[in-house]
Amino acid sequence: MLKLEAPWGDDTRSWGPPFQSGFDGEEVASYFLSCNRGKTIETVNIKTEQDRIRTLIGEVDIVIENFKPGTFEQIAGEIPDNVIVCSISGYGQHGPRRDEVAFDLTMQARSGIMSITGDADGGPAKVGVAWIDVMTGMNAVSSILAALYQRERNGKGARIDISLWDTALAALVNQGHNALAGITPGRMGSAHPNLVPYKAFEAKDGWFAIGVGTENQWHKLVAALELDAPDHWKDNSARIAERSEVEATVQEAVASIDRSTLERLLIGIPNAPVNTVNEALADEQTEARGGLVEHEGVMTLASPLRFLQPSNEKSDV
């Protein structure tokens, strides 16, 4: 992958602290390192080197650009018929907001995601990582793969229009459909609008998440924690109707139990301690799955993709 940066470099090189030695030995923000493993980086001046850019476009299979709508066409000129171009922007290539600038924060705000994130009695909050940015990239990859498959059949490239806005709206999933059904979603902390219990509870030594999604899991929870639960709570709809009572009952039970004991008690029920990021990186499953990899002297998060060969041996891809 060839990445073209402005002569002064990608802005995220300075998005710190923290800073650390990068893949080329230059000190850059850790943020930059999280997004640029495995890329060959060159600098280019889009105002004076358009011929070079157009030559490069003619030599590649895929171009990904995130200029303001309309800018790429001025720079790139005529695109070869077999090249796939994926444009990523804030609001897409058309519509009344197409020329507005956007960040992940503003997407989470305008899309309603911040209105449903955070404690019920607190202010709106954003997800702790650039969630919309990440999912937009995943949507771009999916679209590019589909375009490559199509090109194998007809030999033609494609122009793909991916936006943070479309991604944010699609990411509303069940909450968006709750709104379409006439219910106005709101902030619920770690709780779930359609499942109870499904949230983080305060255990003896920290926060602990428990999620019940089936009647069988509910019965297991009642038995494991010896809950004093009325029979009608076996139905999720009844538990939703009496959410505060159900959650209070579970909270009372877990308050005196430490998290490691809860994990042992709740086998078969989705559960987990609320870890810090450092605890997650040190988890035995992270090591077993190769979740951290060293790349050119820098420790990085591994790709989540795992390819198994027919022999069940891990692929080198």
Residue ranges of model-derived segments:
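Aromatic-enriched alpha-helical interface/lid elements that frame and gate functional surfaces
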Residues: 196-271
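Flexible, small-/acidic-enriched active-site or ligand-binding loops
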Residues: 293-317
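Conserved PLP cofactor-binding pocket of PLP-dependent enzymes
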Residues: 267-286
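Conserved Rossmann-fold dehydrogenase catalytic segment
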Residues: 93, 121-129, 152-168, 186-193, ...
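Short Gly/Pro-enriched turn/cap motifs at secondary-structure boundaries
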Residues: 32, 188-193, 198-199, 241, ...
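N-terminal helix-loop segment corresponding to the beta1-alpha1 unit
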Residues: 1-153, 317
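Glycine-rich beta-alpha junction loops
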Residues: 8, 91-92, 164-169, 205, ...
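Oxidoreductase and adenylate-handling cofactor-binding alpha/beta cores
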Residues: 137-157, 170-181, 222-229
